A protein has these predicted regions:
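Core AdoMet radical
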Residues: 1-67, 77-92
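Auxiliary Fe-S-binding modules of radical SAM enzymes
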Residues: 66, 70-151
């Protein structure tokens, strides 16, 4: 990945404990971003593990967003959120998405709203293209600052 410096690699895991074990043995070039999945409050502990990794960009993927989140975003450079898609998709509540966005705004963390998924903001089932990407009437496409230097 370091040799392909013109690409940005976004590596995502649910196995944050394993990530912490492996992180010291890996090189972390600035084009390798690392993230953890945080679907609901049950998985917030993954964020503490993520903070231990010396990547230039550490991010959260809150997709599918399956519950309300109360986050400490210190040391996090980006948050992605989205609803679940697929035949057995569970709906994402509007309040969960707006609360997460508001936490990002409060803490100065870029927020990217990827999709509503298989349900719209009222919880009605639809196709992803029908449910769209707007949150409170806006597209949230914020990205992290790629020039951050790790300590």
């Amino acid at each position: 990945m370091a040799k392909a410096h013109w690409h940005t690699f976004q590596v995502l895991t649910k196995r944050s404990g394993r990530l912490v074990d492996l992180a010291p043995s890996l090189s972390w070039p600035p084009n390798v971003w690392i993230g953890v999945s945080v679907e609901n409050q049950r998985w917030v502990s993954r964020i503490d593990d993520l903070r231990k990794v010396p990547a230039s960009i550490r991010f959260l993927s809150c997709e599918p967003l399956l519950g309300a989140l109360d986050l400490d975003l210190q040391g996090i450079e980006w948050v992605i959120a989205g609803g679940e898609s697929g035949h057995h998709a569970r709906p994402m509540k509007l309040q969960w998405a707006t609360d997460l966005r508001d936490q990002c705004l409060r803490d100065g963390v870029p927020f990217f709203f990827k999709q509503w998924g298989a349900h719209d903001k009222e919880g009605r089932r639809g196709r992803k293209k029908q449910t769209g990407r707007l949150l409170d009437g806006e597209m949230w496409n914020q990205m992290p600052n790629r020039t951050r230097v790790t300590a």
